[in-house]
Each structure stands twice: as C-alpha cells, then as structure tokens.
Swiss-Prot record:
Statement: the UniProt record of this protein carries the keyword Cytoplasm: no
Primary subcellular site in the record, as a coarse category: secreted
Intracellular or extracellular location(s): Secreted
GO molecular function, one term: neurohypophyseal hormone activity
Propeptide: 44-50
Family the UniProt entry places it in: Belongs to the vasopressin/oxytocin family.
Name of the featured protein: Terepressin/terephysin
A GO cellular component entry from the record: secretory granule
Domain remark in the UniProt entry: The cysteine framework of the terepressin is C-C.
InterPro entries: Neurhyp_horm, Neurhyp_horm_dom_sf, Neurohypophysial_hormone_CS
Amino acid sequence: MKCSVLQMSRLSWTACVLLLPLLLLTLQGGVQGCFIRNCPRGGKRAVDSVQPTRQCMSCGPEGVGQCVGPSICCGLAIGCLMGTPEAEVCQKENESSAPCAVSGRHCGMDNTGNCVADGICCVEDACSFNSLCR
C-alpha cells in the first residue's frame, strides 16, 4: 500500500497537533525556576510533602540578617538591605535544591509572610510595612 503525499501531509499534521501540547508541557516543567520559598507547583522544589528543613542563609554586617529573597537581606538590627553588597550572598541560596525557612512571626495576607525586621513583613519575593511586625 502506497501513501500519497497528501495522506503523508495529513498524517504529519495530525502527529504535530497531538505531540505539540505534550512537548510544551514537558518543556514548561523543565525550565520553570524559582527562588528560596516562592516556587510554584511544578517548580524545582515543589514537592508538597517537603517542608523547609533549614534556616535561610545569614547575611548582612557580621551575619546578623537572613536572606529572604535573591537580593534581600533583613534582620532586626539592620532592617532590610535590598540590592546592596551585603545582600549579594543571598543569590547563593538559589544554588540549593532544599528549601529554607525564613525566621519570624507570621504576617501578611493569610499569614503567608514573616516579620523579618521592625515593622517589615516579607511575603515570597516582596516586602512591605506591617504594623503586626513591631
């Protein structure tokens, strides 16, 4: 049985239509990245049963702060340092495959953030003023 060019074209088109979504889903799972504790479902640390097992890295002058984002170092004695040389060490947190836990009282919408300095609450990769953190 011989296939005509038209039949081969339809067969190829059908295969592409069926395989393209599968390929896109596979690629999406492989390239999705995240930092410290803001990983979406499917991200590199997104295993639901895995809870943070270690404290986030120390940073700031004399290591008195903790990393709460890729360029954010916060501590009670120093407030929050964002994008400064003291906060650069926080980028190394991305190299770890294990999630870390940010210390501090829960705050923010639905208590998903942590008080990291006097009056400052950080949620995932954003920080804001919060009266509960005093």
